[in-house]
Amino acid sequence: MMDEDKDHTRGAELVAQMEGALNQAFDEISFEMGFNGEKHELILTPEGDKVKLFELIYFQKHAPKEVLEHWNILVGRQPLQNIGLRTENGLDISGDDVQIWLEEQGENSFAISAYCEKLLPMLREEEGRAWWMLTTLTDQVLGEIPHMRYIDSFDVLEEPKAEPSFLLSQLPDKLREQGLELSTDPEAYLESYLGYKMEPKQDPDADWRLDVMAGSTCCVPLDRKSVV
């Protein structure tokens, strides 16, 4: 169908068909489709959820070879130069339209504050939509995997800060200056782990997980759920 859609008029139909296929494997799934000049591309996005990332990689690694002859299946939005988004009223937003303030929170951990004058009307009327556009644009400028790996806090401002800022389009270079590797390999990201210690519960009726004294995890969100 994508090959036949030369005039790009069947986008909604294509998305619905792909969504129906993916919903056989996932309860909820966010994805994008494209064409790189040689193959069609299916980009599966975890939307910042590390638990979902494990699921998407499993799906990617088990794709039939017949499918991979015609499709590239990628996990995480890929960084693209000169990328931009368009609002429903036809307003184009690029990385050059967004001011960024970057604050170091810890080792390889940063907070972002973003200000975009073009999106102020949307921010006031459709705050969630404005947040989605700015976080998605950051994914596309930086790459979704580096975004998940290094940006632990994201704030959208209604007015700029007094401190000096830089453009969102410069964010990859700013992070490289910090010595960070901006790999888009999701498996490499999942190989990183966190060690922890805790006081074990002595109550014999406590949940099993609560008698652990020390451990490590590659998926902090899932580990937190197990101790709640």
PLM segments and residue spans:
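Long, hydrophobic alpha/beta structural blocks
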Residues: Q81, I93-C218
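Conserved small/polar residues in nucleotide/adenosyl-binding loops
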Residues: K225-V227
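Short, flexible loop/turn elements at secondary-structure junctions
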Residues: P46-G48, V75-R77, C116
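Surface-exposed, low-hydrophobicity interaction/linker segments
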Residues: M1-I29, E187-D207
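Long, charge-dense
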Residues: P64-L85
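Long, disordered, Ser/Thr/Pro-rich
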Residues: M1-K6, E38, R86-N89, M213, ...
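An N-terminal, globular interaction/scaffold subdomain
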Residues: T9-W71
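Generic structural motif
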Residues: I29-M33, I73, N89, V98-L102
